[in-house]
Amino acid sequence: VRIAVAGGGAAGFFGAISAATHDSSAEIVLFEATHKPLHKVRISGGGRCNVTHHCFDPVELAKGYPRGYQELLGPFHRFQPKDTIAWFEKQGVRLKTEEDGRIFPVTDQSSTVVDCLLNAAKALRVQVRLGARVKSIQAAVPAEDAPQFEIELQDGMRQPFDRVLLATGSSPHGHRLAQALGHTIVPCVPSLFTFKVSDSRLEGLAGISFEKVKLTLTDKNKNRLEQTGDLLITHWGLSGPAVLKLSAWGARMLQQCGYQAELAVNLLPDFSAEKLYQDLLTYKEQNGKKRVHKEPVFPVPGRYWSRIAQYVGIAQEAIWANITNDAMNALVLELTRGRFAVSGKGIFKEEFVTCGGVSLKEVDFKTMQSKISPGLYFAGEILDIDGITGGFNFQSAWTTGWIAGESMASRE
């Protein structure tokens, strides 16, 4: 059996490794257009490579995918983070789990993961061709036992193959190859980005973070999205897990409104505005001589507390005894419904992800085989699947790659 893999990223390599593992007699050729295989693996997670996420319940895991959660349920019952960890550890790559659930190699170096995949492919006799761009894939009408695909490379070389795995990531060229074989491409838009916000309340406070904040994003058509999680002030606006989750779930909505929207921030979602107001009244009665700016009444960073006090018009030297009810109401409003104008998207350097790709309706997720062109398989980001940040995008690449490889090897 001759198997071609187009794309030398996480999904392509893992698909090739899986096919070779399940059928040692198969001839497997991996074509990578550049001279840098596994480039995203190398640069992700700030160069540490966030291999997967510490979530071993397939149903819970699937909830980390704005696009693909339904389709990935079955595959995750067959190959999930536990299997990813077991595979890497068997290859000698030890992994560790961080507090937020992200899993990294103990070396904290993505090169450990890159080398592991390159060595595994080599040991299994996968032929890796670098600088080999697949120009076209022709599906032949297969005679008995005849190869059913002809792959033409950019240099004009043509080769016959029985099965083809498309794992070209978010590359438009890969989408064109899929389209030429009859597939529908869901238009791509960015996912996982930070929010650009220019606001006096944030100026000079980059690096300050808040735990367990509730964010509500509203566009001009009154579409609303909510997320909870940690929030981080940056030099250009807002970031952190809560913002990144909003950007993923709202990828299409935000693209349609030109990344202009209103963000309401509730820093204390566990308390009602009424309760906070009563607490301020009590505090005022007991601490009349204290300066308002001196220390926060609630668990928010001191510098931010002072900033919002200034924002609502409370003078630097003002003491609690002189604070009006209106000023206290304004403080509560800032803590529970601070409104910010999102004016654009920033770059999240840890992960680069798009939403969009090959329509999931056209793929059989039991095998990752095309429902349109038999013998054609898909894995990774070429599909209209994307996850939130934290190792989810690599996990879908490992899972779909592994299943595609197994299916290509065992298909009669």
Regions found by a protein language model. Give the residues of each.
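Short hydrophobic core segments
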Residues: 4-6, 31, 134, 158-171, ...
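Short beta-strand to alpha-helix junction loop
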Residues: 72-82, 99-119, 129, 167-169, ...
